[in-house]
């Protein structure tokens, strides 16, 4: 697959591709929200509204089939950009046995390990050592050159032991890893001033001895410039890169949460703006896309999402009485469990 981020960062094709992933993810997640509120989805629904610019830029900057990407719960845009088909998402949330989780998880823990996307771990921060381990394994196999491993976390995850251990190991080993911190100002409902004492999370980069970047996560052009540079430095041997994106999630922690703890002052502030609307203006103002093109994309993606939802709704859900438990049997002989 073509790597648009290679060479000229402000590439027209690159930016259009990023925006398309942002838009496709937003339309998909709006549909998921409606399905959840209608009682069609069992379990939680976690959206990436307001964080699409960061997520889609990273997913587009990585090379499918070569790089590794461990997405966060709010990374539908990045998943889409990295090649995950929409049907994987709708099948998972709607419990289809045809989905990547075979109906066993109606949530966001799916992955595409064969394509370099490990399954998402709910304990945020835990994917930092996972990506470090995947990269280290490739070094031991002699196939690390030219690869990058990336993951996204939230501001709260920077307080975890897994984040510290994983980033410290990656720094010592000079692994080509990019960690994107989406600082949406609240770790669930815990504000930044109760989460860390430094003025800016990017200051942590100096302590670990890794590259550090800070970017306005609501600005597509800024995200494209900074994230592509971080990926480039990691790929060229510069070691781990920490990118802190300042933004605000535009919904609650999940669709079960109204986010009442976020003040109107914060919501109406600079980072409360919608990155999709910002990106749309940037594309049009810089003659990278027309209003008619964007309208056509919206219509196309809405139809694509509707088809994916309809297909998943027609498919069977798991039948526990006829479950063969092959997920366990592929690793351990089923007779061992029976004997015990």
What residues fall within each predicted segment?
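Glycine-rich ThDP/TPP pyrophosphate-binding loop and its adjacent helix/strand module
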Residues: 117-314
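Short, well-ordered beta-to-alpha junction loops that form the rim of enzyme active sites
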Residues: 73-74, 245-247, 317, 325
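Phenylalanine-focused residue identity feature
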Residues: 4, 14, 19, 68-69, ...
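Conserved acidic/glycine
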Residues: 1-54, 60, 251, 256-340
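Cofactor-binding active-site loop characterized by glycine-rich and histidine/acidic residues
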Residues: 30-33, 40-173, 191-197, 202, ...
